[in-house]
């Protein structure tokens, strides 16, 4: 039920020599509920625990695994630790580790400006001291009215700790330093390491002197001076590190405007949505990695074509632009240009950064300042143009498929001449439906309303016809209600007011 219980249970688990013992707290578990990809991976969670402990055993067969897990469960229950002990194998166990791995990105989903910040996330102590250390850690945070995210390597005494602080405020900025100083002293008390897994760098380099002592720190300085007297290689990371709060992304107290957007961003504004990107780089996948995100990066292998780059450039200009219309920057347009609006990031990005939505919103404001390109108007009016073509579909299809006229149309419209243009079906779905005779079985089981978008109506009409016939044979009467166009063409080109 609590983090403390999980850490005490961890000590029991370690006696059985697991291959891994990892902590995931309730903050991350709550974030998984709002993430489409990770919501599927939390199937084993029962109730709303304060934390879960994921223990992995690798043995020769399942019988041996079961014998160990039965002993671990019995010992934990005997001392009142834990209430649900699912044992998972194979593909199901992979889902747990996928959820655990996504923890860092999921933390960006916390609503508002207060975020889980990596100020002291790498502390490590002797695993037997871990429960007491975390209790002391949380007492310090409680004193300052703060809470923290806890996750990761319980089995090795190295829990990632991220206090939730609003770095955009002067108060939050001051707390950032205060927490770093007080936790560094606490780690020293437990003879631990302030950077148990990753480097010290600009964030924790300031505290190396305190961690290793004056004599050892001087040895580090002498070593640096001997082999790199000009401080060429990675300067100011281990020795002579500047104060940890002098190079922050946000200027404390800096005011950002209230953005009037056409889309609604749930519990946040557009800047806060862009700020959800924490730079984890899940969008830098190749086609061999599986998944969709991000197709433009898979093709170009250029950082500017990643989900991360698009979120970052929008965040930068919305925060620091001097223009009244902060979207009016060619640099943003160039980075957004190759986004396919495939929505892969909406489900696969652990931080749920929806670049397709961000791009559409950006384009509308950019067009407000710079006008709408002819090609975008053409695509936006796809339904109207298809309606005109549907009056004489055979003539339309001849024009777009003929090498001369088709090439001319593409050049005028601004399409690549190698691309094929969509053709029209011989009739529209709505016209066919109006004249067709319903199946004798239709209506025996009820009624279905079929919403016919412009693409099904004009292009993929056979799919619509097959759907109607199938539903009627299954016993449903079908009705196609009058409704507006889907607006997808307008939205895809950023003309969201029309969409």
Regions found by a protein language model. Give the residues of each.
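Ferredoxin-type iron-sulfur electron-transfer modules in oxidoreductases and energy-metabolism complexes
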Residues: 246, 250-389
